[in-house]
């Protein structure tokens, strides 16, 4: 039965992994036996997630009390390179408004529990509001959330149909609620949908006397938390002679009671009045054509200064509208219709770029090892809200700005993200043995730097994402920028949040110049962690060209052919992106073709390269690696995701640098095989067989968030990649020298990994001994007896 349940789980949720396992097992004369053992070894759905999901389903039917605590928290401030997202935190539940790329990563760093998230509200079906939804959905599924309700604009739910080819969310039920369904209400609050329409559409619809609410691409929300029941004052009950027992419950529930002596005690005499729920509004006007719909909508009137009751006036309005709209006189007029006491929070480009302290903390510590390889990241200060908006109580919302609705109504900024470079450096110096290792590194690297002083400054390799599967606070998912020269760069893969990483590394607006020099994007395969950042990057490049006054030429994107249906669906359901790039099928770039295809030759000429080719690797279907050679003869090979692959070895022969995935440590070779990934030693071996002058390891499992386990196979031609690491040819001899200092810098984390590895080895040895033990052999306990 256990094997059957495992098989059912894989058939339902991991069909691709099942096919790979079957191929691994069925390759010899003992296929039946091997397949039997294979099924027995298959993983079941994680027990903890399964139990949590069952508990959550059961808990949904149980009555819940009204929340005593409600806080609005800015998770993504909407500044340059940052997502924009509002998180509503209550005692029993969480609610999210918009989910841009990088939201999941910020939630992880800032310890925002996602296990209680079941409702996400979208203000506009633009990629900037929902680009982080696929990754977040995978995370909440894995932690046992049974159902996710999506609220608002049309077609938002289509995202899950679009991602079905590379993302499995079968254990997560997706429910869409439309404006026509009426207000949403649960134990915490009631949310009224307010659809907004373009001016022309709105005018025609109103003349006809009807409007398709479910067809709206923009929706505002009026949120009213339920009243908090009044408190029972036990002192007053004692004074009135109410005995302990069920009568107290009756009074608490609002019912008058008669005491045994005939005295009538009214509930209102011993229970304080209910506390009304403070109203908050979430709104976005993405462009001028929606402005009239906002101004003319009567739904807001009852929550502005003209509200019939003071408690109905909005206490806070959260604006996702861009600065270009908020600065229009008509929008300012709408803001001033609210009471002067209403707080207005702007989640847009008024904010600064700082949203994560973790990435800066890591970079400040690594900067001590080499200021050129690990340059400090850029932080742009908030641009500031114009005076007329400030006078209307509008302020830029920074990450972790909070507005407390209950209890103690008010704005809180004590938790806003700040940096403390001195503390980060002090942490590094406090690491055992770090000072000694750093001195040794400086002495050794000085000699190496002199030896390589004549090396060229280009190409430059900037690692933007070095993690596999999901982003973490220290490592983002796959992306590598290669600056071929000052005026030309290419991008290898483009995982979620790649644009955010670029802004941190280059700063704003310098990042615009980098985007303008982007000559090509190479996507190795269509797993989520390798391409979900593409749409945001393409849009940012378009804005950069416009800002710099340059021609808006589409950029070539080489990818598997299924990229075209994906972007076409984005065109139809969200926003047009296909005109921003020209598609090149990776199959047309294959290295082993007798004569180069026209697309390959054109791309080589455009990039002024000597050669550029793709190679099929051993991962999922249509997974590719790439090789490129500059006019000067410098050769780079990029593996993408793969297990050791002979074709990659042949295609990359003689490479100056091999960038190879090393998802797992050597002791997880079996797991790496089943998931078609490579271990560190396997990646190093590929580099050796290829004859690569240097091998750079990347794409680490998040279990190695700080530093991968360094095996005996590491040598003078092997380096380990980190996010925001800049590597030039002259830096290559220095990279292997970093390992002793890195192990000291992350000593606690590294020792923890070593202990886990030792524990796994002991368990394997014990299991091996148990299998070899003959039946009936007395145990040690019996023998001693």
Segments the model singles out, each with a brief description of its role:
Residues 114, 124, 129-130, 140-210:
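Conserved, well-structured beta-alpha core segment at the onset of a catalytic domain
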Residues 1-29:
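N-terminal chloroplast transit peptides
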Residues 146, 156-177, 543-554, 563-587:
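Active-site neighborhood of divalent metal-dependent phosphoester bond hydrolases
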């Amino acid at each position: 039965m256990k094997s059957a349940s495992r098989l059912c789980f894989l058939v339902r949720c991991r069909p691709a992994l099942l096919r790979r396992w079957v191929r691994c097992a069925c390759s010899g004369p003992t296929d039946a036996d091997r397949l039997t053992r294979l099924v027995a070894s298959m993983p079941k759905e994680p027990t903890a997630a399964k139990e949590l999901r069952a508990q959550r389903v059961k808990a949904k039917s149980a009555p819940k009390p009204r929340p005593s605590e409600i806080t609005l928290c800015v998770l993504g401030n909407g500044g340059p390179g940052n997502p924009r997202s509002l998180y509503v935190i209550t005692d029993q539940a969480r609610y999210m408004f918009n989910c841009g790329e990088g939201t999941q990563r910020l939630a992880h760093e800032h310890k925002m529990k996602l296990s209680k998230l079941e409702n996400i509200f979208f203000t506009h079906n633009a990629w900037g509001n929902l680009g982080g939804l696929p990754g977040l959905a995978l995370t909440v599924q894995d932690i046992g959330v049974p159902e996710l309700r999506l609220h608002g604009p049309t077609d938002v739910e289509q995202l899950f149909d679009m991602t079905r080819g590379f993302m499995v969310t079968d254990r997560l039920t997706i429910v869409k609620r439309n404006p026509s369904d009426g207000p949403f209400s649960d134990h915490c609050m009631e949310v009224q949908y307010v659809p907004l329409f373009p001016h022309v559409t709105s005018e025609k619809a109103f003349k006809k006397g009807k409007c398709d609410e479910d067809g709206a691409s923009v929706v505002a929300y009026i949120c009213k938390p339920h009243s908090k029941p009044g408190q029972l004052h036990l002192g007053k009950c004692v004074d009135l002679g109410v005995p302990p027992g069920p009568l107290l419950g009756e009074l608490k529930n609002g019912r008058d009671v008669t005491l045994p002596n005939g005295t009538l005690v009214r509930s209102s005499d011993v229970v304080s009045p209910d506390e009304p729920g403070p109203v908050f509004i979430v709104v976005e006007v993405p462009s001028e054509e929606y402005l009239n719909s906002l101004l003319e909508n009567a739904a807001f009137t009852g929550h502005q200064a003209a509200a019939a009751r003071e408690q109905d006036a909005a206490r806070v309005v959260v604006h996702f509208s861009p600065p270009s709209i908020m600065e229009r006189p008509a929008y300012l007029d709408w803001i001033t219709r609210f009471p002067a006491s209403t707080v207005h929070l702007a989640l847009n480009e008024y904010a600064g770029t700082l949203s994560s302290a973790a990435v800066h903390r890591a970079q400040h510590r690594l900067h001590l090892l080499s200021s050129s390889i690990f340059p400090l990241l850029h932080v742009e200060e908030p641009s500031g809200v114009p005076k007329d908006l400030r006078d209307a109580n509008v302020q830029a919302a920074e990450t972790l700005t909070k507005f407390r609705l209950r209890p103690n109504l008010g704005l809180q900024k004590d938790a806003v993200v700040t940096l403390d470079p001195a503390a980060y450096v002090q942490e590094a110096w406090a690491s055992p043995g770090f000072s000694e290792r750093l001195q040794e590194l400086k002495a050794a690297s000085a000699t190496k730097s002199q030896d390589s002083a004549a090396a060229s400054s280009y190409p430059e390799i900037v690692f933007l994402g070095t993690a596999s599967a999901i982003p973490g606070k220290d490592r983002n998912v796959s992306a590598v920028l290669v600056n071929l020269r000052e005026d030309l760069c290419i991008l290898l893969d483009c995982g979620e949040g790649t644009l955010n990483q670029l802004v941190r590394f280059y700063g704003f607006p310098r990042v615009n110049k980098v985007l303008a020099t982007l000559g090509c994007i190479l996507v190795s395969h269509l797993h989520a962690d390798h391409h979900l950042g593409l749409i945001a990057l393409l849009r940012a490049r378009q804005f950069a060209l416009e800002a710099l006054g340059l021609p808006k030429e589409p950029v070539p994107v080489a990818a598997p052919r299924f990229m075209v249906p994906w972007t076409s669906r984005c065109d139809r359901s969200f926003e047009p992106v296909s005109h921003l790039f020209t598609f090149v099928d990776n199959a047309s770039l294959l290295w082993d073709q007798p004569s180069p295809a026209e697309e390959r030759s054109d791309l080589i000429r455009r990039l002024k390269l000597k050669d550029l080719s793709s190679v099929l690797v051993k991962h999922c279907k249509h997974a590719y690696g790439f090789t490129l050679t500059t006019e000067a003869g410098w050769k780079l090979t990029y593996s993408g995701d793969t297990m050791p692959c002979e074709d990659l070895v042949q295609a990359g022969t003689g490479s100056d640098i091999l960038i190879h995935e090393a998802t797992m440590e050597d002791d997880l070779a079996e797991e790496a095989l089943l998931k078609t990934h490579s271990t560190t030693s396997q990646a190093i071996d590929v580099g050796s067989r290829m004859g690569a002058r240097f091998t750079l390891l990347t794409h680490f499992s998040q279990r190695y968030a700080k530093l991968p386990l360094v095996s005996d196979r590491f040598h003078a031609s092997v380096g380990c990649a980190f996010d925001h690491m800049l590597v030039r040819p002259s830096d290559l001899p220095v990279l292997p020298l970093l390992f002793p200092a890195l192990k000291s810098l992350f000593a606690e984390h590294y020792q923890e990994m070593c202990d886990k590895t030792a524990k796994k080895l002991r368990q394997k040895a014990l299991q091996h001994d148990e299998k070899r033990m003959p039946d009936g052999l007395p145990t040690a306990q019996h023998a001693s007896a």
